[in-house]
A protein has these predicted regions:
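Flexible "arm" and connector segments at domain edges
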Residues: 1-222
Length: 222
């Protein structure tokens, strides 16, 4: 299973669980309207806030590169959700075929060297927002999203790590008493998200199943 297929599969499961099966028709199980493009738009606006663009305050602030990664991953959740929705209502391809189609479209996914001109990065984000509302085409938009990731220094491998890390850690927490208040968040002096990042860094291309198992091993030692 490719990394793209893994992420699409995890997102489908997450949406089925949180929104209810049939969410592709535009409503949650509670009857709330879903608008993934609006989600993308608002997350993209938060991405812009990672830059010290304001001329009236915090003018000496630095670009928050760590938050840029976080926001790009959040946008990816919503891009995949829109991809899955449109696919279900139109082509209804199996996820494996959908993943191949996206991989063929986006090509090589290495990150570029980050430029000093962060205003150019902001403009690139705004160009992505424009595509949401002008001449929107799903595969082309997905390709543009990955072009933005490249410009902002986020590689596909790093995106994959961050995505499955967030997804699997949330599942792990729920499985181990997070809602009930019995979950232990600090493991031998380290927060669980730090342990998760260390596990991800120790093995390139780790699968969700491997990550969950390693988390269980570390948790049992806490």
């Amino acid at each position: 299973m490719s990394q793209m297929e893994i992420m699409l599969t995890l997102q489908q499961k997450l949406n089925d669980s949180t929104n209810g099966e049939g969410w592709e028709n535009g409503l949650t199980k509670q009857g709330k309207k879903i608008d993934w493009r609006r989600c993308i738009y608002l997350e993209a606006a938060e991405l812009v806030e990672s830059y010290p663009w304001k001329h009236w305050k915090n003018i000496d602030a630095k670009v928050d590169r760590a938050n840029i990664e976080v926001e790009l991953v959040d946008i990816w959740h919503f891009v995949m959700s829109e991809v899955l929705r449109v696919n279900r209502l139109n082509d209804n391809l199996p996820i494996v075929e959908l993943a191949i189609r996206l991989e063929d479209a986006i090509g090589k996914l290495d990150a570029q060297k980050i430029e000093d001109d962060y205003y150019a990065e902001i403009e690139a984000i705004e160009e992505l927002i424009k595509k949401l509302f002008c001449h929107f085409e799903l595969v082309d938009f997905t390709k543009s999203y990955f072009e933005l990731c490249r410009k902002l220094g986020l590689s596909f491998e790093r995106l994959y790590q961050l995505y499955i890390g967030k997804n699997i850690l949330n599942i792990f927490r729920q499985d181990h008493g997070y809602k009930e208040g019995t979950y232990i968040k600090v493991w031998n002096g380290k927060e669980d998200n730090v342990v998760m990042q260390e596990i991800l860094a120790s093995k390139s291309g780790i699968t969700p199943e491997e990550l969950y198992k390693r988390l269980e091993e570390k948790y049992s030692e806490a």
